[in-house]
Design a protein with these regions (language model features):
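Short amphipathic alpha-helical segments and their helix-coil junctions
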Residues: 71-76, 161-180
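A short, conserved, highly charged catalytic patch centered on acidic carboxylates
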Residues: 1-104, 112-140
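Short, polar/flexible loop-turn hinges at active-site or ligand-entry regions and domain interfaces
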Residues: 76-82, 175-181, 201-209
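N-terminal amphipathic/basic helix or basic patch
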Residues: 5-13, 159-166, 170, 184, ...
């Protein structure tokens, strides 16, 4: 008789090697956001439902891994992927569809009772997307490989690009209301995007109590990032001069809401 516990043990043993980087929850979650999203995710309809494993990254809370297990390899995936309670792919995709309303989700379907017979399928369901996309191969990977593959995937690139377009459009409209010249708006948006690539700035910008101090920090960070990109000498000096208006334009450095709320 097929024993799903064997499948779970194999899966648990693999991911338990990475507990320095991840947290593993089994058939429940202490995260209120996750719990709320799964409140009607029962595979049989009605009520809460939970996958065998929910894995979250300690350094990247935007991504969840959900894993659904079946002992019988013939119960790996149904033709229409709508037999949620009976097939591992179907169930994993169901949970991913619910959790993708608040997270990017890597859904992993596992079937088989031995390492030799194990079947593994991976799907990436990005937040607010309508469907999941196959990704990776048919073997377990390390959690670092999962994270790096997700971050570098074409799907994630497209999501980030679209988010960036929305951000720059909204920011441009906001700056227009402060009567910032179009040429200066472009420079300011560029400076913000450059500065946000700097981890230290990204973590600390909200701590500035005065917009004047934030403006100084922004310009210094941009200069540091440009220098790190091997832009030096006269070229760096010219770029710093172009960005310097951020410190001197009173509509930016004096109006509290303008610069502070642009990130």
């Amino acid at each position: 008789m097929a024993n799903e516990r064997k499948t779970e043990i194999i899966t648990r043993d693999h991911f338990s090697k990475f507990l320095d980087s991840i947290d593993i929850e089994e058939q429940r979650s202490d995260n209120p956001k996750i719990d709320k999203l799964l409140k009607s995710a029962s595979k049989k309809g009605g009520g809460k439902g939970y996958p065998e494993f929910i894995i979250s990254y300690k350094t990247n809370p935007d991504l969840l891994i959900v894993i659904e297990c079946k002992a019988d390899v013939t119960k790996h995936e149904s033709k229409d992927r709508d037999k949620y309670a009976d097939f591992s792919v179907d169930g994993a995709l169901l949970y991913a569809s619910y959790l993708s309303k608040g997270f990017d989700v890597l859904a992993i379907a596992v079937s088989g009772e031995t390492k030799q017979s194990l079947r593994v399928s991976h799907f990436l369901h990005l937040r607010d997307e309508k469907k999941a996309t196959p990704i990776f191969g048919d073997k377990f990977l390390s959690v670092d490989d999962y994270l790096n593959g997700y971050l570098k995937s074409p799907e994630k690139f497209r999501q980030d690009y679209n988010s960036l377009l929305d951000f720059t459009k909204q920011l441009n409209e906001k700056l227009h209301t402060y009567k910032i010249l179009e040429s200066q708006r472009s420079l300011l948006i560029s400076s913000i995007l450059i500065a946000l690539e700097n981890t230290a700035f990204k973590r600390s910008y909200a701590s500035h109590k005065k917009p004047e101090n934030l403006a100084v920090s922004l310009i210094q960070t941009v200069s540091d990032e440009l220098e790190s990109a091997n832009i030096t000498g006269k070229k760096l000096e010219n770029l710093n001069t172009q960005f310097s208006f951020i410190k001197t334009d009173t509509s930016l450095s004096k109006k509290r809401k303008c610069l502070e709320r642009n990130y």
